[in-house]
UniProtKB/Swiss-Prot annotation:
Signal peptide: none annotated. Gene3D superfamilies: Ribosomal protein L9, C-terminal domain, Ribosomal protein L9, N-terminal domain. It comes from Hydrogenovibrio crunogenus (strain DSM 25203 / XCL-2) (Thiomicrospira crunogena). InterPro entries: Ribosomal_bL9 (IPR000244), Ribosomal_bL9/RNase_H1_N (IPR009027), Ribosomal_bL9_bac/chp (IPR020594), Ribosomal_bL9_C (IPR020069), Ribosomal_bL9_C_sf (IPR036791), Ribosomal_bL9_N (IPR020070), Ribosomal_bL9_N_sf (IPR036935). This is Large ribosomal subunit protein bL9.
Length: 150
């Protein structure tokens, strides 16, 4: 199925490109999320009429992501959790916990944008993670996990 991308989609293409994707991917993901439209003659004409507006919105989103990047990159957040004698946490710390800590630090981040390639944190220590603010802007943060006395 051919679709027109209405925004940049990672590993697929950028705004305005016509790409061939599997029909299920288009129907179940791209079209419902407003990232693409079927590449019909009517939709192509409508897109060309709105191209400048969509490019302006994309540029504004990139500019705001870069502004947040300037403030967030290198930020250190501390999360306290109950841990055993050897530093193993009772439970784990995941993306939701990191997103909460970032929101307390003044950053509005969705948990799906936090990249934890090795999964949830289960030990006390200092860890580095990436936060995808935009498909072109990725900030690096440091999370310090400290043990608390119950």
């Amino acid at each position: 199925m051919n679709v027109i991308l209405l925004e940049k989609v990672q590993n697929l293409g950028s705004l305005g490109e016509q790409v061939a994707v599997k029909s299920g991917f288009a129907r179940n993901f791209l079209i419902p999320q407003g990232k693409a439209k079927p590449a019909t003659k009517e939709n192509i004409a409508e897109f060309e009429a709105r191209r400048a507006e969509l490019e302006k919105l994309a540029a504004e989103a990139l500019a705001s992501a870069q502004a947040v990047y300037e403030k967030m990159n290198g930020t250190v957040v501390t999360i306290e959790s109950v841990a055993g004698d050897e530093g193993k946490l009772f439970g784990s710390i995941g993306t939701a916990d990191i997103a909460d800590a970032l929101s307390k630090a003044g950053f509005d981040v969705e948990r799906k944008n936090i990249r934890m390639p090795e999964g949830a944190l289960r030990y006390v220590g200092t860890f580095e993670f990436d936060v995808e603010l935009h498909s072109d802007v990725v900030a690096s943060i440091t999370v310090e996990v400290k043990a608390t006395e119950e």
